[in-house]
Amino acid sequence: MSAISVGQAIILGVVEGLTEFLPISSTGHLKIAEGLMDIQVDDKAVVGFTAVIQVGAIAAVLVYFFADIRRFVTAWGRGLANPAARTNHDYTFTWWVIYATIPVVLVGLAAKPLIDGPLASLWVVAASLLAGSALMWFADQYGRHKRGEDDLSLPDAMIVGTSQILALLFPGFSRSGATISTGLIRDLDRVAATRLSFFLSIPALTGAGLYELKDAVGGGVSAAPLAVGTVVSFFVAYASIAWLLKFVARHNFNAFIIYRVAVAVLLAGLLAGGAINA
């Protein structure tokens, strides 16, 4: 019997697609949803399943930003083949994304027992939701938001990419919340910070999904729930990306901050009352 049913996979796919790129924590919401459905959140197969369905969300990024990604890959390939083409900003930016992914990969491999064990607790999710909200508020209030995508530098990419470690270690912090907030603190405007967050998500989440695939399949999740959850997350994530880019062009992040705090308080109350298990 599969550790996750097709019906549960649909629900988790919707949650993943809605929350992966919104700064509200997909991992936190997935763990909450799993807890409410009496799915063991620290089960190896379940952890693997949640990582694999992220690939659907990443596929949505690849489709949505296909023109940008094709431009980056083309420039990178030309630069590798021809040293004279290495002055192209797209060639340089592609290397920045690769460099900026290295820290989170190293920490992810080294800290995996902690990530899959004690740090998977829903109490950690509640605390991380609050901590991430504080960072978002600070970044939104005190960042100058004056630098666009053309002003990006290697330090920007490295600092923003390294901030993904916060979400890796503390589910509830939010990968997109951490990266966008760090970008704002670096004085990027909201659209530039959000687009950088999307591009950094591609290698990080794809690698995590492929790495965890063996645990999801070998641990007792059948192919049907994996496929359904991934496909659902793709379509929902695509709509979420389009909405978020329009939203950040005109609004601050106060609505997300309020929502995160409310979810953290509600989750803490449910845990304290024994309605769900940590």
UniProtKB/Swiss-Prot annotation:
GO terms for biological process: cell wall organization; peptidoglycan biosynthetic process; regulation of cell shape; response to antibiotic. Its main location: membrane. It catalyses: di-trans,octa-cis-undecaprenyl diphosphate + H2O = di-trans,octa-cis-undecaprenyl phosphate + phosphate + H(+). It is a multi-pass membrane protein. One of its GO terms (cellular component) is plasma membrane. GO terms for molecular function: undecaprenyl-diphosphatase activity. Its EC number is 3.6.1.27. The chain crosses the membrane at residues 46-66, 91-111, 119-139, 153-173, 191-211, 225-245, 256-276. Keywords: Antibiotic resistance, Cell membrane, Cell shape, Cell wall biogenesis/degradation, Hydrolase, Membrane, Peptidoglycan synthesis, Transmembrane, Transmembrane helix. It is found in: Cell membrane. The keyword Acetylation does not apply. Catalyzes the dephosphorylation of undecaprenyl diphosphate (UPP). Confers resistance to bacitracin. HAMAP family: Undec_diphosphatase. Bacitracin is thought to be involved in the inhibition of peptidoglycan synthesis by sequestering undecaprenyl diphosphate, thereby reducing the pool of lipid carrier available. Belongs to the UppP family. This is Undecaprenyl-diphosphatase 1. It comes from Frankia alni (strain DSM 45986 / CECT 9034 / ACN14a). The gene is uppP1.
